Amino acid sequence: MAWFKRTQKGIQTPTEHKKDVPKGLWYKSPTGKIVDAEQLESNFYVSPEDGYHVRIGSNEYFKILFDDNKYKELDKGMTSKDPLDFEDTKKYTDRLKAAQEKTGLKDAVRCAVGKSKGNDLVIACMDFKFVGGSMGSVVGEKIARAADYALKNKLPFMIISKSGGARMQEAALSLMQLAKTSVKLAQLADAKIPYISLATDPTTGGTTASFAMLGDINISEPGALIGFAGPRVVKDTTGKDLPKDFQTSEFLKEKGFLDFITKRSELKNKINLYLDLIQNQPVRA
Protein backbone atom coordinates (compact mmCIF):
# COMPACT_ATOMS: atom_id res chain seq x y z
CA MET A 1 0.00 0.00 0.00
CA ALA A 2 1.22 3.47 -0.88
CA TRP A 3 -0.80 5.45 1.67
CA PHE A 4 2.25 6.18 3.78
CA LYS A 5 4.91 5.80 1.11
CA ARG A 6 5.63 8.04 -1.80
CA THR A 7 5.42 5.98 -4.97
CA GLN A 8 7.56 8.44 -6.87
CA LYS A 9 10.67 9.87 -5.30
CA GLY A 10 12.21 13.25 -5.95
CA ILE A 11 8.91 15.09 -6.47
CA GLN A 12 9.41 18.82 -5.96
CA THR A 13 6.88 21.63 -5.90
CA PRO A 14 7.87 24.82 -7.72
CA THR A 15 8.31 27.70 -5.28
CA GLU A 16 5.74 29.84 -7.06
CA HIS A 17 3.07 27.20 -6.41
CA LYS A 18 3.66 26.96 -2.65
CA LYS A 19 1.03 28.57 -0.46
CA ASP A 20 2.24 30.39 2.63
CA VAL A 21 -0.07 30.40 5.65
CA PRO A 22 -0.26 33.97 6.98
CA LYS A 23 1.02 34.37 10.53
CA GLY A 24 -1.38 35.31 13.31
CA LEU A 25 -4.47 33.57 11.93
CA TRP A 26 -4.96 31.61 15.13
CA TYR A 27 -4.34 32.16 18.82
CA LYS A 28 -3.85 29.40 21.39
CA SER A 29 -4.88 30.26 24.96
CA PRO A 30 -3.01 28.84 27.99
CA THR A 31 -5.78 26.27 28.43
CA GLY A 32 -5.18 25.01 24.89
CA LYS A 33 -8.21 26.60 23.23
CA ILE A 34 -7.70 27.64 19.61
CA VAL A 35 -9.29 30.93 18.57
CA ASP A 36 -9.46 32.65 15.19
CA ALA A 37 -7.45 35.89 15.38
CA GLU A 38 -10.21 38.03 13.87
CA GLN A 39 -12.75 36.54 16.27
CA LEU A 40 -10.38 37.24 19.16
CA GLU A 41 -10.03 40.89 18.16
CA SER A 42 -13.78 41.36 17.75
CA ASN A 43 -14.24 39.86 21.24
CA PHE A 44 -12.00 42.46 22.91
CA TYR A 45 -9.03 40.05 22.80
CA VAL A 46 -10.80 37.63 25.13
CA SER A 47 -10.92 33.94 24.25
CA PRO A 48 -14.62 33.07 23.82
CA GLU A 49 -13.91 29.44 24.70
CA ASP A 50 -12.50 29.96 28.18
CA GLY A 51 -12.75 33.70 28.92
CA TYR A 52 -8.97 34.13 28.99
CA HIS A 53 -7.99 37.81 28.71
CA VAL A 54 -5.07 38.07 26.32
CA ARG A 55 -2.44 40.66 27.19
CA ILE A 56 -2.91 43.78 25.09
CA GLY A 57 -1.28 47.21 24.96
CA SER A 58 -2.14 50.87 24.69
CA ASN A 59 -3.32 50.68 21.08
CA GLU A 60 -5.96 48.12 21.97
CA TYR A 61 -7.08 49.77 25.22
CA PHE A 62 -7.41 53.17 23.55
CA LYS A 63 -9.51 51.54 20.84
CA ILE A 64 -11.75 49.95 23.48
CA LEU A 65 -12.16 53.01 25.70
CA PHE A 66 -12.09 56.07 23.44
CA ASP A 67 -15.12 56.78 21.26
CA ASP A 68 -14.38 55.90 17.61
CA ASN A 69 -10.72 55.40 18.61
CA LYS A 70 -10.21 59.18 18.50
CA TYR A 71 -7.82 60.77 20.99
CA LYS A 72 -5.00 63.26 21.38
CA GLU A 73 -1.72 61.76 22.58
CA LEU A 74 0.17 63.71 25.24
CA ASP A 75 3.98 64.09 25.32
CA LYS A 76 4.25 61.67 22.43
CA GLY A 77 7.95 62.12 21.67
CA MET A 78 9.41 61.80 25.16
CA THR A 79 12.17 59.18 25.41
CA SER A 80 14.53 57.87 28.11
CA LYS A 81 18.17 58.91 28.38
CA ASP A 82 21.00 57.01 30.05
CA PRO A 83 21.99 59.23 33.02
CA LEU A 84 23.92 56.43 34.74
CA ASP A 85 25.72 55.14 31.64
CA PHE A 86 24.30 51.75 32.61
CA GLU A 87 25.43 48.48 31.07
CA ASP A 88 24.54 44.88 31.99
CA THR A 89 24.46 42.27 29.24
CA LYS A 90 24.13 45.20 26.84
CA LYS A 91 24.20 48.97 27.02
CA TYR A 92 21.00 50.59 28.25
CA THR A 93 20.94 52.85 25.21
CA ASP A 94 21.13 49.80 22.94
CA ARG A 95 18.35 48.09 24.90
CA LEU A 96 16.12 51.13 24.51
CA LYS A 97 16.85 51.41 20.81
CA ALA A 98 16.07 47.72 20.26
CA ALA A 99 12.80 48.01 22.20
CA GLN A 100 11.77 51.08 20.22
CA GLU A 101 12.49 49.40 16.91
CA LYS A 102 10.69 46.20 17.90
CA THR A 103 7.57 47.79 19.38
CA GLY A 104 7.26 51.12 17.59
CA LEU A 105 6.90 52.76 21.01
CA LYS A 106 9.01 55.50 22.60
CA ASP A 107 8.72 54.08 26.12
CA ALA A 108 6.55 51.91 28.36
CA VAL A 109 3.57 54.27 28.75
CA ARG A 110 1.36 56.29 26.43
CA CYS A 111 -0.92 59.06 27.65
CA ALA A 112 -3.92 60.44 25.80
CA VAL A 113 -7.10 62.46 26.20
CA GLY A 114 -10.33 61.76 24.37
CA LYS A 115 -14.04 61.10 24.69
CA SER A 116 -15.37 57.99 26.41
CA LYS A 117 -19.13 57.68 26.00
CA GLY A 118 -19.18 61.38 25.24
CA ASN A 119 -17.24 62.61 28.26
CA ASP A 120 -13.59 63.68 28.35
CA LEU A 121 -11.17 61.23 29.96
CA VAL A 122 -7.38 61.24 30.39
CA ILE A 123 -5.77 57.79 30.20
CA ALA A 124 -2.20 56.67 30.86
CA CYS A 125 -1.72 53.12 29.57
CA MET A 126 1.39 51.01 30.10
CA ASP A 127 2.84 48.67 27.47
CA PHE A 128 4.41 45.47 28.84
CA LYS A 129 6.12 44.70 25.54
CA PHE A 130 8.45 47.67 26.06
CA VAL A 131 11.16 46.45 28.48
CA GLY A 132 8.56 44.58 30.52
CA GLY A 133 6.52 47.72 31.11
CA SER A 134 9.21 48.85 33.55
CA MET A 135 8.84 52.26 35.16
CA GLY A 136 11.71 54.63 34.49
CA SER A 137 12.01 58.41 34.48
CA VAL A 138 9.97 58.84 31.30
CA VAL A 139 7.11 56.66 32.55
CA GLY A 140 6.92 58.61 35.81
CA GLU A 141 7.20 61.97 34.07
CA LYS A 142 4.54 61.18 31.46
CA ILE A 143 2.11 59.96 34.12
CA ALA A 144 2.84 63.07 36.21
CA ARG A 145 2.22 65.35 33.23
CA ALA A 146 -0.97 63.50 32.34
CA ALA A 147 -2.15 64.00 35.93
CA ASP A 148 -1.28 67.71 35.63
CA TYR A 149 -3.33 67.88 32.42
CA ALA A 150 -6.28 66.26 34.18
CA LEU A 151 -5.88 68.63 37.13
CA LYS A 152 -5.65 71.76 34.96
CA ASN A 153 -8.66 70.81 32.85
CA LYS A 154 -10.61 69.14 35.69
CA LEU A 155 -10.93 65.84 33.83
CA PRO A 156 -11.18 62.30 35.24
CA PHE A 157 -7.90 60.38 35.14
CA MET A 158 -7.29 56.67 34.57
CA ILE A 159 -4.10 54.60 34.67
CA ILE A 160 -3.96 51.15 33.10
CA SER A 161 -1.07 49.32 34.77
CA LYS A 162 0.84 46.48 33.15
CA SER A 163 4.37 46.37 34.48
CA GLY A 164 7.20 44.35 35.95
CA GLY A 165 8.07 47.22 38.30
CA ALA A 166 10.83 49.81 38.52
CA ARG A 167 13.42 49.90 35.73
CA MET A 168 16.69 48.67 37.24
CA GLN A 169 18.81 50.41 34.58
CA GLU A 170 17.80 53.76 36.10
CA ALA A 171 18.30 52.70 39.73
CA ALA A 172 17.27 55.37 42.27
CA LEU A 173 15.97 57.63 39.49
CA SER A 174 13.42 54.95 38.74
CA LEU A 175 12.43 54.59 42.39
CA MET A 176 11.85 58.36 42.59
CA GLN A 177 8.95 57.92 40.17
CA LEU A 178 6.95 56.11 42.86
CA ALA A 179 6.95 59.26 44.99
CA LYS A 180 6.45 61.61 42.04
CA THR A 181 3.37 59.83 40.71
CA SER A 182 1.91 59.37 44.20
CA VAL A 183 2.20 63.12 44.89
CA LYS A 184 0.40 63.95 41.63
CA LEU A 185 -2.43 61.58 42.47
CA ALA A 186 -2.73 63.18 45.91
CA GLN A 187 -3.16 66.54 44.16
CA LEU A 188 -5.99 65.08 42.08
CA ALA A 189 -7.62 63.77 45.26
CA ASP A 190 -7.36 67.19 46.93
CA ALA A 191 -9.06 68.72 43.88
CA LYS A 192 -11.76 66.02 44.02
CA ILE A 193 -10.94 64.80 40.53
CA PRO A 194 -11.73 61.08 40.05
CA TYR A 195 -8.84 58.69 39.53
CA ILE A 196 -9.46 55.12 38.35
CA SER A 197 -6.74 52.49 38.58
CA LEU A 198 -7.04 49.43 36.34
CA ALA A 199 -4.48 46.74 37.20
CA THR A 200 -4.03 44.28 34.35
CA ASP A 201 -1.88 41.19 33.88
CA PRO A 202 0.82 41.56 35.16
CA THR A 203 1.01 44.43 37.66
CA THR A 204 3.98 43.95 39.98
CA GLY A 205 6.86 45.66 41.78
CA GLY A 206 7.01 49.41 42.22
CA THR A 207 3.92 49.93 40.10
CA THR A 208 1.85 48.01 42.65
CA ALA A 209 3.59 49.90 45.46
CA SER A 210 2.52 53.26 44.03
CA PHE A 211 -0.15 54.42 41.59
CA ALA A 212 -1.72 51.01 40.86
CA MET A 213 -3.22 50.84 44.36
CA LEU A 214 -4.06 54.51 44.89
CA GLY A 215 -7.25 54.78 42.85
CA ASP A 216 -10.52 56.16 44.11
CA ILE A 217 -11.53 52.77 42.81
CA ASN A 218 -9.05 49.98 42.13
CA ILE A 219 -10.28 47.52 39.54
CA SER A 220 -8.89 44.67 37.47
CA GLU A 221 -9.56 42.10 34.78
CA PRO A 222 -10.21 38.40 35.44
CA GLY A 223 -7.16 36.29 36.23
CA ALA A 224 -4.65 39.15 36.35
CA LEU A 225 -1.39 38.68 38.27
CA ILE A 226 -1.07 41.48 40.83
CA GLY A 227 1.56 41.66 43.55
CA PHE A 228 4.88 43.10 44.64
CA ALA A 229 7.30 40.20 44.28
CA GLY A 230 6.21 37.32 42.05
CA PRO A 231 4.78 34.07 43.48
CA ARG A 232 8.01 32.14 42.85
CA VAL A 233 10.10 34.73 44.70
CA VAL A 234 7.67 34.80 47.62
CA LYS A 235 7.66 31.02 47.90
CA ASP A 236 11.46 30.78 47.70
CA THR A 237 11.84 33.50 50.34
CA THR A 238 9.26 32.23 52.83
CA GLY A 239 9.74 28.53 52.16
CA LYS A 240 5.98 28.05 52.44
CA ASP A 241 3.32 26.90 50.01
CA LEU A 242 1.17 29.75 48.74
CA PRO A 243 -2.63 29.93 49.00
CA LYS A 244 -4.69 28.89 46.01
CA ASP A 245 -4.96 31.65 43.37
CA PHE A 246 -2.40 33.71 45.31
CA GLN A 247 -1.80 37.16 43.75
CA THR A 248 -4.62 36.84 41.25
CA SER A 249 -7.19 39.60 40.87
CA GLU A 250 -9.84 37.30 42.34
CA PHE A 251 -7.68 36.67 45.44
CA LEU A 252 -7.07 40.40 45.93
CA LYS A 253 -10.74 41.26 45.56
CA GLU A 254 -11.62 38.67 48.20
CA LYS A 255 -9.07 40.26 50.56
CA GLY A 256 -10.39 43.77 49.92
CA PHE A 257 -7.60 45.20 47.76
CA LEU A 258 -9.83 45.60 44.68
CA ASP A 259 -13.27 47.14 44.39
CA PHE A 260 -14.40 44.97 41.50
CA ILE A 261 -13.28 42.84 38.57
CA THR A 262 -14.69 43.52 35.14
CA LYS A 263 -14.65 41.69 31.87
CA ARG A 264 -12.95 43.68 29.15
CA SER A 265 -16.17 43.80 27.13
CA GLU A 266 -17.85 45.64 30.02
CA LEU A 267 -14.92 47.90 30.93
CA LYS A 268 -16.02 51.04 29.10
CA ASN A 269 -19.55 50.92 30.45
CA LYS A 270 -18.47 50.24 34.02
CA ILE A 271 -15.90 52.99 34.32
CA ASN A 272 -18.33 55.49 32.83
CA LEU A 273 -21.07 54.33 35.19
CA TYR A 274 -18.71 55.00 38.09
CA LEU A 275 -17.79 58.43 36.71
CA ASP A 276 -21.46 59.34 36.28
CA LEU A 277 -22.22 58.36 39.86
CA ILE A 278 -19.22 60.02 41.52
CA GLN A 279 -19.66 63.23 39.51
CA ASN A 280 -23.40 63.33 40.18
CA GLN A 281 -24.28 63.17 36.49
CA PRO A 282 -27.21 61.43 34.79
CA VAL A 283 -26.28 57.78 34.32
CA ARG A 284 -25.61 57.00 30.67
CA ALA A 285 -26.89 53.72 29.26
Curated annotation (Swiss-Prot):
Pathway of action: Lipid metabolism; malonyl-CoA biosynthesis; malonyl-CoA from acetyl-CoA: step 1/1
Signal peptide: none
Stretches assigned to the CoA carboxyltransferase N-terminal domain: 24-285
GO biological process, one term: malonyl-CoA biosynthetic process
Annotated GO CC locations: acetyl-CoA carboxylase complex
Domain of life (superkingdom): Bacteria
Gene3D superfamilies noted in UniProt: 2-enoyl-CoA Hydratase, Chain A, domain 1 (3.90.226.10)
Pfam families in alphabetical order: Carboxyl_trans
Class of enzymatic activity (EC top level): transferase
Catalysed reactions listed for this entry: N(6)-carboxybiotinyl-L-lysyl-[protein] + acetyl-CoA = N(6)-biotinyl-L-lysyl-[protein] + malonyl-CoA
Keywords: ATP-binding, Cytoplasm, Fatty acid biosynthesis, Fatty acid metabolism, Lipid biosynthesis, Lipid metabolism, Nucleotide-binding, Transferase
EC number: 2.1.3.15
Database matches in InterPro entries: AcCoA_carboxyl_beta, Acetyl_CoA_COase_Trfase_b_su, ClpP/crotonase-like_dom_sf, COA_CT_N
Described function: Component of the acetyl coenzyme A carboxylase (ACC) complex. Biotin carboxylase (BC) catalyzes the carboxylation of biotin on its carrier protein (BCCP) and then the CO(2) group is transferred by the transcarboxylase to acetyl-CoA to form malonyl-CoA.
Family: Belongs to the AccD/PCCB family.
UniProt-listed PANTHER family: ACETYL-COENZYME A CARBOXYLASE CARBOXYL TRANSFERASE SUBUNIT BETA, CHLOROPLASTIC (PTHR42995:SF5)
Subunit record text: Acetyl-CoA carboxylase is a heterohexamer composed of biotin carboxyl carrier protein (AccB), biotin carboxylase (AccC) and two subunits each of ACCase subunit alpha (AccA) and ACCase subunit beta (AccD).
Protein name: Acetyl-coenzyme A carboxylase carboxyl transferase subunit beta
Originating species: Christiangramia forsetii (strain DSM 17595 / CGMCC 1.15422 / KT0803)
Gene encoding the protein: accD
